[in-house]
């Protein structure tokens, strides 16, 4: 199969939405029956984002095969059916590490290792390898044109376009077209300068996607086309909208997919966007509203919980409920008390690392249990629910996780020292293992117990969900906690690790060691989140006995 390539770059400022624009184009092409994949090339020197601060970089998205990747891959999977893998995201750090490893092995036969050709060749090889078997590969280069860090990537895609030829490669550039209220018009000069910068490194964009708070007027589109050397029909206006899921329709209405198909000589049927129309309809026509409290430690940057935020919205669509997320700093629960949790229709405690705010999360789980507020715990959110139950119901005073207190009398959560990964390989860890890339990662099989809420929600005896953790329930103390009434509703493939717990004495109290948010999509939702938001709606309507 011959693969065609669309290279996506950004200019003027960062955070323009390259990932959303690229994913929207991918969704339209997929709706035309094409097999589409996407890639994100990140210019930073970290080998992967696994150890980067969520408040700087946003969430780490985990793929089925266990890669810790950029959050844009989450957008990709929410917009298209293709599942991302470790091949779909790589960093400058990863490329340099590979090249240096080969140099140490002697693979380059004594050559002087340089950015060109060794680094650029390594980038090109990874792009080609990661796109095999698809009609179209959309490759997003992180950062902004002009950044020093992105230059090797820009040079690599320039070379690739030359090698592939115009019939198999094209460039799509995102820019900002700001509106100046004082002048009463949009300004095209930043776009012109951005394209000039791109031209200086040998790349002529074929399509310009212009971000603005309004549609770009026809005269300005003509001006941009003239000065940036692109066709007028290739100047696409991407105005601000109230939902990212409206972007596919917006850019399709301007013929973006037709430009791509014409360039590549692809004869494909018109895009069927009926599924996206249904999503937009559900979003615009809720029948009720719920407020869900997310108790976390990274709340100053909502992107730290991007997939959780989106999964809650998707669940709202499936229940025809408008979901308002109230972010609660877990440290506020510690200092101000549980009063900050009052008035919430449901409580969610997401994943996290470190002991800052941990007692606040434990108190949030206690508040939800005692006040019959629907509770969903994810990863650390499951562990704090277990710790709280052990302390306050099972009589295990001072119970804790060894992550936070190595000397606790009741270490109900401890480091996983051995497990079987998704490929059947035995993994081992110790307290002195590196932090990067050493967690239990990727999609794992989970057995669901009969007669549990988890089994009812999923409708299956076995499921596959993605993991990212290094601590687990201590099986030595499990019997005492279960005897006190907490139900273990999900177990790992070898039935040695606890994957889900629930409280049968509570209307809706479910927690999972895995990350269900990574597999939620706007078109399909996710059963765990759908059940949680449904319970929030029931609680809001006063249907739960308190």
Swiss-Prot record:
Highest taxon, organism lineage: Bacteria
GO cellular component: cytosol
A Pfam short name: CTP_synth_N
Keywords linked to the UniProt accession: ATP-binding, Glutamine amidotransferase, Ligase, Magnesium, Metal-binding, Nucleotide-binding, Pyrimidine biosynthesis
InterPro entries referenced in this protein's UniProt entry, alphabetically: Class_I_gatase-like, CTP_synthase, CTP_synthase_N, GATASE, GATase1_CTP_Synthase, P-loop_NTPase
Pathway where this protein functions: Pyrimidine metabolism; CTP biosynthesis via de novo pathway; CTP from UDP: step 2/2
Positions annotated to bind L-glutamine: 352, 380-383, 403, 470
EC number: 6.3.4.2
Residues that, per the record, bind ATP: 15-20, 72, 239-241
Gene Ontology terms for molecular function: ATP binding; CTP synthase activity; glutaminase activity; identical protein binding; metal ion binding
GO terms, biological process: 'de novo' CTP biosynthetic process; pyrimidine nucleobase biosynthetic process
Location of region: Amidoligase domain: 1-266
Residues that, per the record, bind UTP: 14, 187-192, 223
Record text on activity regulation: Allosterically activated by GTP, when glutamine is the substrate; GTP has no effect on the reaction when ammonia is the substrate. The allosteric effector GTP functions by stabilizing the protein conformation that binds the tetrahedral intermediate(s) formed during glutamine hydrolysis. Inhibited by the product CTP, via allosteric rather than competitive inhibition.
Catalytic activity, reaction form: UTP + L-glutamine + ATP + H2O = CTP + L-glutamate + ADP + phosphate + 2 H(+); L-glutamine + H2O = L-glutamate + NH4(+); UTP + NH4(+) + ATP = CTP + ADP + phosphate + 2 H(+)
Active site location: 379, 515, 517
Binding-site positions, CTP: 14, 147-149, 187-192, 223
ATP-binding as UniProt keyword: yes
Binding site for Mg(2+): 72, 140
Domain Glutamine amidotransferase type-1 residues, every copy: 291-542
Function, in words: Catalyzes the ATP-dependent amination of UTP to CTP with either L-glutamine or ammonia as the source of nitrogen. Regulates intracellular CTP levels through interactions with the four ribonucleotide triphosphates.
Similarity section: Belongs to the CTP synthase family.
Quaternary assembly: Homotetramer.
Other remarks in the entry: CTPSs have evolved a hybrid strategy for distinguishing between UTP and CTP. The overlapping regions of the product feedback inhibitory and substrate sites recognize a common feature in both compounds, the triphosphate moiety. To differentiate isosteric substrate and product pyrimidine rings, an additional pocket far from the expected kinase/ligase catalytic site, specifically recognizes the cytosine and ribose portions of the product inhibitor.
Protein name as catalogued: CTP synthase
């Amino acid at each position: 199969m011959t693969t065609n390539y669309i290279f996506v770059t950004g200019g003027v400022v960062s955070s323009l939405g390259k990932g959303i624009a690229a994913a929207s184009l991918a969704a339209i092409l997929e709706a035309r029956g094409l097999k589409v994949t996407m890639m994100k090339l990140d210019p930073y020197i970290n080998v992967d984002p696994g150890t980067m601060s969520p408040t700087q970089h946003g969430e780490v998205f985990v793929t089925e095969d266990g890669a810790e990747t950029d959050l844009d891959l989450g957008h990709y999977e929410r917009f298209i059916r293709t599942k991302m893998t470790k091949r779909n995201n790589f960093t400058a750090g990863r490329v340099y590490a590979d090249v240096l490893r080969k140099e140490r092995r002697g693979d380059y036969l004594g050559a002087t290792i340089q950015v060109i050709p060794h680094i650029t060749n390594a980038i090109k090889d990874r792009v080609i390898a990661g796109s095999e078997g698809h009609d179209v590969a959309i490759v997003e280069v992180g950062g902004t044109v002009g950044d020093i860090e992105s230059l090797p990537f820009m040079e690599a895609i320039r070379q690739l376009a030359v090698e592939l030829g115009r019939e198999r490669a094209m460039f799509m550039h995102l820019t900002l077209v700001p509106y100046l209220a004082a002048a009463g018009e949009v300004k095209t000069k930043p776009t012109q300068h951005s394209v000039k910068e791109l031209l200086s490194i040998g790349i002529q964009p074929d399509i310009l996607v212009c971000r603005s708070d309004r549609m770009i007027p026809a005269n300005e589109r003509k001006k941009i086309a003239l000065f940036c050397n692109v066709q007028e029909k290739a100047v696409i206006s991407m105005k601000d909208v109230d939902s990212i899921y409206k972007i596919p329709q917006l850019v399709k209405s301007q013929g973006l997919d037709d430009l791509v198909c014409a360039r590549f000589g692809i004869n494909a049927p018109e895009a069927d966007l009926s599924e996206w129309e249904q999503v937009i309809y559900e979003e615009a026509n809720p029948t009720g509203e719920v407020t869900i409290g997310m108790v976390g430690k990274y709340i100053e940057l909502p992107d730290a919980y991007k997939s959780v935020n989106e999964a809650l919205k998707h669940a709202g669509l499936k229940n025809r409920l408008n979901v308002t997320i109230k972010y609660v700093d877990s440290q506020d629960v510690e200092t101000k008390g549980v009063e900050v949790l009052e008035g919430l229709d449901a409580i969610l405690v997401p994943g996290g690392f470190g002991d800052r705010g941990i007692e606040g999360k434990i108190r949030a789980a206690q508040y939800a249990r005692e006040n019959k507020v629907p509770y969903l715990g994810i990863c650390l959110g499951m562990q704090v629910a277990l710790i709280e139950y052990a302390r306050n119901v099972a009589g295990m005073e001072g119970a804790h996780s060894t992550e936070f207190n190595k000397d606790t009398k009741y270490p109900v959560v401890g480091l996983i020292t051995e497990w079987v990964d998704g490929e059947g390989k035995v993994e081992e860890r110790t307290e002195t293992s590196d932090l990067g890339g050493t967690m239990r990662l990727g999609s794992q099989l989970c057995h669901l117990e009969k007669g549990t809420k988890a089994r009812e929600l999923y409708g299956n005896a076995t499921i596959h969900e993605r993991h990212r953790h290094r601590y687990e329930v201590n099986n030595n103390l499990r019997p005492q906690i279960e005897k006190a009434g907490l139900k273990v509703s999900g177990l790992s493939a070898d039935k040695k690790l606890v994957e889900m717990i629930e409280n049968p004495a509570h209307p809706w109290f479910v927690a999972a060691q895995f990350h269900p948010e990574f597999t939620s999509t706007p078109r399909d939702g996710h059963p765990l989140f759908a059940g949680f938001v449904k319970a929030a709606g029931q609680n809001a309507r006063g249907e739960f006995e308190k």
